[in-house]
Amino acid sequence: MPEWVSNRLKPGGRIGADPTLVSSAAWERWAKKLAENSVYLLPIRNNLVDFIWGSSQPSYSKHDAHVWPIEYAGKTWQEKVAAVRTMVEGHGCDAMVVTSLDEIAWLLNIRGRDIPFSPVLRAYVVLTKSQISMYVPPNKLDLSVQRQLRTDNCYSAFCVRLQNYTSIWEDLRTLSQVWKKVLLPAEDEFSQGVSRAIYTAIPVDKRHVAQSPIMTLKSEKNPTEKEGMRKAHIRDATAFCDFMAYLEDKMADGENWDELKVAHYLDKFRREQNLNRGISFRTIVAFGPHAAWPHYVPSNVTSLSVDRSSILLIDSGGHYLDGTTDVSRTFHLGSPSDREVDIYTRVLMGCIDLAMLQFPHYLPIRNIDVLARAHLWQAGVDYRHSTGHGVGVYGSVHESPININWQSKDAKMFRVGYFFTEEPGFYQEGQFGMRLENVLEVVQNNFNSTHGPFLSFRIITLIPFEPKLIDRSRLSPQQKRWLNDYYSRIRSEVGPELRRLPNMKGYHWMMDRTQPFLVDCDSSAAVSLNHVFLLVLLLSLGLA
C-alpha cells in the first residue's frame, strides 16, 4: 500500500487514515515507507468510507455474547484475571489494554458471533490491579454473561464494569494520567497489537509495548482444554469420514457433484456433530487446477464439477464447545498419475517426519519447518506458505504465537500444551495442488537428559490419508510404523463413533483406508530422519 500511494503523490503530499482501524505497528511501517518519498501519513477523525456508506451502511452483528462454560474452559475467569495481573505487574505496569478479540473471549470465558467463523465479540478490556472495565456495544451481553461477570454493583477487583464501546479512547487519555506504565500488546504473528488510536491515547513516557501476557497464557492449554481438543477432533473425524463415504457412494451411483456442493454437505455433516458451533473458516474444496491455489474458495461462478479425473483437495474445520479443528486431506477418486503419487508421498513423508520429532525444549519453533519441506526439496520443489500455525480452543483457528516458517526471525520455542498445525503442500499452476494438514499437541517427552526437558508431538487429527496416492516403497520402516500406530488409533478412537451412526458406510470407508503397512528394513529410498534432524539442529545453531 505505501508503495502504491508514494507512486501517485508528489513530495509533500499527505494521506489520511483512520487510526482506530490501523494497528500502531502497521502505521509506523507505512509512515516510514511514505516518508522516504516525503509523503506524510496523518490521522483523520471522520472515516471517509463510513461517510460514503451513509444510511445504507450495514449494521454490526446483533447476536448476543454467551458464556463459555467452566467444564470446557477449565479455569474461571477470575483465575485468569489474577494470573494476567501478576504478569502485568511483572512488566512494571499498573494497567493493560486488551484489544485482541480472541484474548478478550478467553480471558472472560465468553464467546460471541460478531466475526464470521470466529467465536468472538467486538470489545475492549482495560485491566488494572483493582478494576476491570469492558468497552462493549449496548445490549451485547445477555443476562447469563452479566451474571458471570458480576456487572451489577461492581465494586471489587473481580467484577466487570461495562462502558460504552466508543468511549475507550477518551477514557484512556483521562485514566492514563494516574497510571505509571501501561502495557500495550505488541504485534505478534496473527495478533495485530493495539491500534494507532489507542497507542497515541497513552502518553509517550507511559507506554510499555510488549508481547501480550494473555497470548502466553492462552496458548498453553490447561488439562481440561487439552482433553476437549482431543475429543473435538474425534467427533470432527467422525463427521469427515462419514461424509467422504457418502460422497463416494453418491458419485458411484452417478450423482453429479461440484466443489460448492461438496463444501455444503461437509459443513452439514459437521454441524450435526454434538457440541458443534459452526465451521472455523470458509471450507476450501478445490478440484484439479483449482487445487493449485492454496487459498481458493469455491463460489457460484467458479465451482468446478468434481469427477474422477484429477486431485480433490479439501481444507476445512469446525468449532466445538470443547475445541477447534483444522484439517486438510487430498484425494483422487480415479487413477492418479505417477507424478501425483510421487508428490503426495513426499508431502506425507514430511508430515510424518515432523510428527515423529523428539527435540530439546530450546529448539526454535521455526527450525522444524525443514522437516516438512525436506522431501519436496529433494525433488526441487517447495511451497510458499508457512508450514503451520497455532490453534485455539473454541477460539481463533490461527492463534499466536506459533508460525512455523524457516524464514521467520522470531526465536520463540515450543511449550507443553501448545496446539498447532503442520500443513506441507505442493502447487503446480494450471494442473493440480495438494496439501496435508494435521493438528499436533506439544507434549513432554520422558527422556532423562542432561540437556533439560525434551518435547515431542502427539497428532490429534484422526482422518486417514489417501492410500492410492502413497508409494509405499518410498517410506522408511520408521514412517511405516508411525502410520500403523496412527491408523490403529483412528480405528480405536474414531471407529466406535462411526459404529454408532445409523449406517456403517463411514466405518467401512475408514477401515478400508487404515489397512496396516508391511514393515521391512530395506526402504533405502527414503531420507533418514536422523539426517534431516541434523539439518534442523545445524540451522538452530546457525551453522547451516
Q: Where is each model-derived feature located?
A:
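A short, hydrophobic C-terminal helix/tail in secreted or cell-surface proteins
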Residues: 526-534
